[in-house]
Amino acid sequence: MAPPSPREHQSAPATSATKPDAEMVLPGFPDADSFVKFALGSVVAVTKASGGLPQFGDEYDFYRSFPAFQAFCETQGDRLLQCMSRVMQYHGCRSNIKDRSKVTELEDKFDLLVDTNDVILERVGMLLDEASGVNKHQQPVLPAGLQVPKTIVSSWNRKAGEYGKKAKSETFRLLHAKNIVRPQLRFREKIDNSNTPFLPKIFVKPNARKPLPLALSKERRERPQDRPEDLDVPPALADFIHQQRTQQVEQDMFAHPYQYELDHFTPPQSVLQRPKPQLYRAVGETPCHLVSSLDELVELNEKLLGCQEFAVDLEHHSYRSFLGLTCLMQISTRTEDFIVDTLELRSDMYILNESLTDPAIVKVFHGADSDIEWLQKDFGLYVVNMFDTHQAARLLNLARHSLDHLLRLYCGVESNKQYQLADWRIRPLPEEMLSYARDDTHYLLYIYDRMRLELWERGNHQPVQLQVVWQRSRDICLKKFVKPIFTDESYLELYRKQKKHLNSQQLTAFQLLFAWRDKTARREDESYGYVLPNHMMLKIAEELPKEPQGIIACCNPVPPLVRQQINEMHLLIQQAREMPLLKSENAAGVRKSGPLPSAERLENDLFGPHDCSHAPPDNYQNTSTDGTLPLQKQPSLFTEGKEETSVDAGCLLATAVITLFSEPNTEEGGKTPLTVAQKKAQNIMQSFENPFRMFLPSLEHKAHISQAAKFDPSSKIYEISNRWKLASQVQVQKEPKEATKKKVAEQTAAREEAKEEAAAGVLEQAIPVRQQAALENATKKRERATSDLRTIEQKQEKKRLKSSKKAKDPDPPGKDFSPYDYSQSDFRAFAGDSKSKPSSQFDPNKLAPSGKKGVGAKKCKQSVGNKSMSFAVGKSDRGFRHNWPKR
């Protein structure tokens, strides 16, 4: 039944007429609560009325038999469907629930209703979240170029909304500005993207306990090159190459500059005692300084030298640079926050080495694995005495190890991670991004105190757990930045990760595209993902487009550098298509000679903690044939050439092998002496006789036959030998053992000669059956010929088999073999008995019988007689024609 309208309902609020329409939330209702109460009453009334309808079954079928009830149900059902369709149209859902021509099944109508309810409830939840201030649909901030900027159609919506929405919209446009000046263009030193090892940038080593190598000093960097061939190479790298050429290693200039200091570092006793957490100051009460000049950087370094600990964090950008750029550094002390513009002070950041390498000052990082490498790569900065809160969180077995979780756990602060992937190259930085960067280090020192306290309590008031965290942090400080080095086999690593099979042409295209991408990225100082992403490169290699437009079709969106150099890429694809097409190769199949095995496998098998003798071969590749381990003789900078290996007696890998019953190696003349144990084993093996070899002679006559057993009537061997006649006893008795090899050679030669003669005789003497039949009929006045040509062929085949069997049985030497001449044979023997009953089957190749019936004989003779000049008189080499029966 239809619910009563608001106008007809008696419980409508009486105050609706007294209040003006402007103050009403809905027409006839002053506030939302009154409307909810009224709507709830209507829903309850409708539910109660629907419950009073006849139930589906016998009762409903009975009422359905009355026309009035049927008409009432159809009318009310159409009203309900019409209302539901309007609601669905209002919410943008499919509203063809009333159209019986489109939706006829009840299940389909129910599915439409369920989908509409889901949409409505989802929208209600979104509106409730928006009303309560919780917005779950914040868009993540991505680097510029990844999203298409929104086009402003007109000017009326520029200043729409409240002030907060306006500020948020302006920030969004600022983050995704398309035109950003590349900061690499303003750097003093040129970025080194060459395909050479990374050279440390440090030239001054403060807090040093071991001096800096001479090759890394500033005097050596500024000194002109002594060798003219090294003018285009940095001085330190030229010295390294020269040392590799002359094999004179003076100092390892590629080692960690603070290796000695970190190896001998011990945490101060003040940090290994029970800490007293010091609460952080409020963000509004803490001063924040933006460092963008050299004087401010020097002042910052002086302040840091007077602190006992400070927190450090970095913001990095890697999408529009080959090696990446460190765009910002955040430093926080107990009383102040600093944000350093590293793009502006890139060449002067080495000043902070004095405070970062001071072993008396604790540097607090969170997840410093990448930060340590970025500091070395861009600024030549190194860290001594670091505490990594990420390692402490792992040691404490927290639920999560992220900084966001630590802020929520220890400080009760909800961090906003929408700027985590922002483009930090933007200058000037907006206020939101500065606030986000500041929060990363502002609370970190308090978290450091709280985690130290928990580690102290977990270690039973002993600094054991604290020392473990400092040890792990020290290992992170020892990490070194390594440049990506391109080789001819670099593409194989990416190819194996894709887990796809490519043929020779596709793999060649993949290799050429990988080399082109690496060269372009280094030259343009762009990342691999910006030049040509991996999935696009693999798609092009799989498709092998014939036209440049096909390359464009494989990329969506098309990278700018691909569009610029489309012709060069097309030439590479054509070069790959000219390769011969081979079968699909697996990633393991194209694996070439790689580096030497890991040094972790080089352990003594006798004293190792694990038994590695039965380890699978997948984890260890030993390319030597004698089970020894190859070791590299000399270190090599470039590994394209063949590396020489040597065998170390202390690193032999062998498995247990029982060689007692193995056959001796007689390749070197058979002079290998046998030990006593091997002689005994040989005697034992000779006593075991194969029963088949005892009465079946081998072709090479190398099988051992027991003479006593073969001539003993009581033995089974004697019975088998007499039954099967497989071995001639007389021949075995007469044949001397000394002449076995000579006899085998003679028999083989005689067998081959007999085969050749038999084949020649058969070819010469074998006359076609039809010609033989024609000759016989002409000379003997057309007597009855052979009954069946197939029988003759079978006889000939049997004779050939008999002759071949005779040829296989060698005759005694000296007896000549002469094949039988079948041309003088009488083939009447194959004609059969004249009294035999003729076959009931008709054979078209069979001649008519030459009897005394007169007419039949004459007709038969006329069939072969002279009819024209084309038939020769006498013999006919073309045989006889078929005699088909008349109808």
UniProtKB/Swiss-Prot annotation:
Start and end residues of each HRDC domain: 503-583
Domain of life: Eukaryota
Keywords (A to Z) from UniProt: Cytoplasm, DNA damage, DNA repair, Exonuclease, Exosome, Hydrolase, Isopeptide bond, Magnesium, Metal-binding, Nonsense-mediated mRNA decay, Nuclease, Nucleus, Phosphoprotein, RNA-binding, rRNA processing, Ubl conjugation
CDD domains xrefs: Rrp6p_like_exo (cd06147)
Region (Disordered): 1-23, 734-757, 777-887
An annotated GO cellular component: cytoplasmic exosome (RNase complex)
GO biological process, one term: RNA catabolic process
PTMs per UniProt: Sumoylated by USP36; sumoylation does not significantly affect EXOSC10 nucleolar localization and association with core exosome and USP36, but regulates the nucleolar RNA exosome activity in rRNA processing by promoting binding of EXOSC10 to pre-rRNAs. Effects of sumoylation on EXOSC10 levels vary between different studies. Sumoylation of EXOSC10 is required for the modulation of EXOSC10 effects on cellular protein translation and cell proliferation. Sumoylation is promoted by mild hypothermia.
UniProt keyword Thylakoid, yes or no: no
Compartments (UniProt record): Cytoplasm; Nucleus; Nucleus, Nucleolus; Nucleus, Nucleoplasm
Binding, Mg(2+) 2: D313, E315, D440
One Pfam family cited in the UniProt record for this chain: HRDC
Cross-link Glycyl lysine isopeptide (Lys-Gly) (interchain with G-Cter in SUMO2) placement: K19, K583, K710, K835, K861, K875
EC category: hydrolase
Stored InterPro entries: 3'-5'_exonuclease_dom (IPR002562), Exosome-assoc_fac_Rrp6_N (IPR012588), HRDC-like_sf (IPR010997), HRDC_dom (IPR002121), HRDC_dom_sf (IPR044876), RNaseH-like_sf (IPR012337), RNaseH_sf (IPR036397), Rrp6-like (IPR045092)
Free-text tissue specificity from the UniProt record: Expressed in ovary (at protein level). Expressed in testis (at protein level). Expressed in lung (at protein level).
Residue ranges constituting the 3'-5' exonuclease domain according to the UniProt record: 289-455
Basic and acidic residues biased stretches: 1-10, 778-796
Residues the UniProt record annotates as site (Not ubiquitinated): K583
Cofactor(s) annotated in UniProt: Mg(2+)
Cited function: Catalytic component of the RNA exosome complex which has 3'->5' exoribonuclease activity and participates in a multitude of cellular RNA processing and degradation events. In the nucleus, the RNA exosome complex is involved in proper maturation of stable RNA species such as rRNA, snRNA and snoRNA, in the elimination of RNA processing by-products and non-coding 'pervasive' transcripts, such as antisense RNA species and promoter-upstream transcripts (PROMPTs), and of mRNAs with processing defects, thereby limiting or excluding their export to the cytoplasm.
Subunit and partners: Component of the RNA exosome complex. The catalytically inactive RNA exosome core complex (Exo-9) associates with the catalytic subunit EXOSC10/RRP6 (via its N-terminus). Exo-9 may associate with DIS3 to form the nucleolar exosome complex, or DIS3L to form the cytoplasmic exosome complex. The RNA exosome complex interacts with cofactors C1D/RRP47, MPHOSPH6/MPP6 and MTREX/MTR4. Interacts with MTREX; the interaction with MTREX mediates the association of MTREX with nuclear RNA exosomes.
Name used for this protein in its record: Exosome complex component 10
Organism classification: Eukaryota, Metazoa, Chordata, Craniata, Vertebrata
Gene: Exosc10
